[in-house]
């Protein structure tokens, strides 16, 4: 499953879940309506960096920006997330980052504040489980030798 198929799989899970539950919780629907984002991991990689979910910028919520490449990811505004991650592994242009490293958020839903993200998803363990199942399938496809958690939120899962 490549990044396009992964995005389709996530969308199918969400659409089936919405259809089945007919839920009307504004917070989780708002999260879903922001659009999904996945990293392009087209090759198997030795090292996989996991985050919990993509950030969200209300001013720049571009729903057409659905894919990114880890080695080219750039920070927006005051965030230094990507700069720190690249530096941890030898810099954006290092052989490790360019050729041997992938990135995958456990959830494709955009939200910058981890506590808010967890609070919104807490009542919807079924949705969380379905999304994580697709993420697990992608991790198995990438077949990393080592998984590094970008933060304690991703370590929890």
Predicted segments, located by residue:
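Glycine/proline-rich loop-helix segments at beta-alpha junctions forming the active-site rim
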Residues: 111-157
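Mobile, glycine- and charge-enriched loop segments
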Residues: 46-53, 57-127
């Amino acid at each position: 499953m490549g990044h396009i198929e992964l995005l389709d799989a996530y969308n199918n899970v969400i659409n089936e879940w919405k259809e089945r539950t007919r839920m009307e919780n504004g917070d989780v629907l708002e999260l879903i309506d922001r659009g999904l984002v996945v990293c392009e991991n087209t090759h198997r990689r030795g090292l996989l960096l996991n985050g919990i979910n993509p950030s969200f910028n209300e001013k720049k919520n571009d729903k057409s920006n659905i894919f990114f490449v880890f080695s080219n990811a750039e920070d927006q505004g005051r965030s230094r997330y990507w700069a720190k991650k690249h530096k941890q592994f030898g810099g954006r242009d290092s052989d490790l980052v360019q050729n041997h490293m992938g990135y995958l958020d456990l959830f494709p839903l955009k939200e910058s504040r981890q506590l808010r993200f967890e609070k919104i998803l807490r009542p919807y363990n079924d949705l969380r489980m379905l999304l994580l199942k697709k993420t697990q399938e992608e991790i198995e496809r990438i077949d990393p030798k080592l998984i590094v958690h970008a933060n304690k939120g991703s370590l929890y899962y």
